[in-house]
Design a protein with these regions (language model features):
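N-terminal Rossmann-like dinucleotide-binding module
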Residues: 13-78
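Non-transmembrane alpha-helical segments in soluble domains
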Residues: 7, 49, 72, 89-92, ...
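Beta-loop-alpha module in the N-terminal Rossmann-like domain of NAD(P)-dependent dehydrogenases
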Residues: 67, 82-138
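N-terminal secretory signal peptides and thylakoid transit peptides that target proteins
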Residues: 1-14
Length: 138
């Protein structure tokens, strides 16, 4: 065996032992993400409307019943099994195993708390700036 071929073959085998498990365990690139929405009114509308047809909305949360009701009616047309919550902490408790990511569209001073909770659960977070209300939260 030529040394160059040995090194090349060894590199391919070694690389595949690390690379293949990540491919097999990952989601299909064509599969939809399971999204949770935190804050569905006001600016939140502009954050969830673009993805309503491309991703699975599995949970939504808003403290304002008017916004939640309007959003729920629209989201349920495409995602009839979406769950509605008033408190994002309850949503995380009940839905954490069903979520891949959350979109946080709450007032600025509440971004940090919802985002850090989601990240601690291993969820991906989509959030607008500012992420934190003050420097001590960063």
């Amino acid at each position: 065996m030529i040394r160059r071929n040995f090194i090349k073959t060894s590199g391919i085998i070694l690389g595949s032992t690390f690379y293949l498990p990540s491919i097999l365990a990952s989601k299909n690139l064509n599969s939809r993400l399971n999204i949770g929405l935190i804050g569905v009114g006001g600016r939140g509308i502009q954050n969830w409307k673009p993805i309503i047809r491309t991703e699975n909305i599995v949970a939504m949360c808003d403290v304002d019943d008017r916004w939640a009701y309007n959003a729920l009616n629209e989201i349920k047309q495409l995602h009839p099994n979406v769950k509605k919550f008033k408190d994002y902490r309850v949503m995380f408790d009940k839905m954490k195993n069903s979520l891949d990511a959350v979109i946080i569209s709450t007032p600025y001073h509440t971004h940090f708390h919802a985002a850090i909770t989601a990240m601690e659960l291993g969820l991906h977070v989509c959030i607008e700036k500012p992420v934190a209300h003050n420097v001590w939260e960063c």
